[in-house]
Each structure stands twice: as C-alpha cells, then as structure tokens.
C-alpha cells in the first residue's frame, strides 16, 4: 500500500538550550547534534554534549527513544542514524518515530536512508538546503506487510553488523 512518508512516522523537532546559561549544560541528558553521527555505524552511542533537566525543560528539545531514527535537516542534509538510548537533540535534525502497527522501526530507518537522495532533491531554502516537514509530505513509498518489513530489516541489519565489525577490524589494523 502507498503512503506519504509523513503518514508512517511522527516527525519530531529538536531544540537547543540557551548556551549563555551554564546551568543548562553538562548534565545527565545526552544532547545530540549532527557532529555525533558516526557514518561507520548505524547507532549513535555517545554525544559530545549533555544538558541538564533545567536545560531540557527550558528549551524546545525533545527526547528520542531507543530505535527512533534521526536525520539532519539543515546544512549537511540527509545524514542518518538510529538512537541507541534516550537522548535529546538540536533543531538541525528531525527525530523520526515509526507509527506502531504500520511500520517497523528498523525498516523505517532503511526506508528513509534509501530515500535520502529523493529527500535532498526536495529540500527548500535559499541559503542552506533544508528538509522541512512538508518534504516528507511530498514523497510516497510502498509499504509491505509488517512481517515482510521485519524480514527485510533483519537482513539489512545483519549486513550492517558485518560492515561495522569489518570497520572495527580495519581501524584496529590501522592503529
């Protein structure tokens, strides 16, 4: 069945606590920016910066859950990762949460990654390319059944896991 990308996921905006308020920073909440994406790995395992509960409460940032996807929406458009544990994130990204019962979380990651070129072609902005919420309305995808999604995602995960192991071996050999 065909769906607009915006129909199969919740699109979550991020935010940044005021940097002029030191009490908002260096807390217990991981705060994700594009710098933290590691293209060699599917998941983000750590963030450069953290925020406090006060920083979280006094900004527009949201908390992503394990297995949510995240995509860079400004500047370096289309970088992707999955969230390995709950973390907040900045406004240069969108969190993408699979609609339960409609799309598998892992499948959504691969579906969006597969469509990054199309997303980039549909960016807006005069100075910087930007993915907006409307960008996700403009793209239609065919969704197989949940069972088929899980099978496809499992195969792709296995391949990604092997690539990650090979990258680690290569990094150890180079060291």
Task: Label the model's feature ranges.
Residues 37-38, 75-77, 124-125:
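Short glycine-enriched loops at secondary-structure junctions
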Residues 104-135, 139:
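Short, positively charged
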Residues 6-22, 35-66:
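Sequence-specific dsDNA recognition surfaces
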Residues 57, 76, 92, 115:
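A generic "binding-loop/recognition-motif" signal
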Residues 1-15, 31, 138-175:
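Non-catalytic DNA-recognition/assembly elements of restriction-modification systems
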Residues 21-29, 43-51, 61-65, 79-91, ...:
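Short, surface-exposed loop/turn microsegments at beta-strand edges and helix-strand junctions
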Residues 73, 87-94, 125-153:
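A short glycine-rich beta-alpha junction/loop motif
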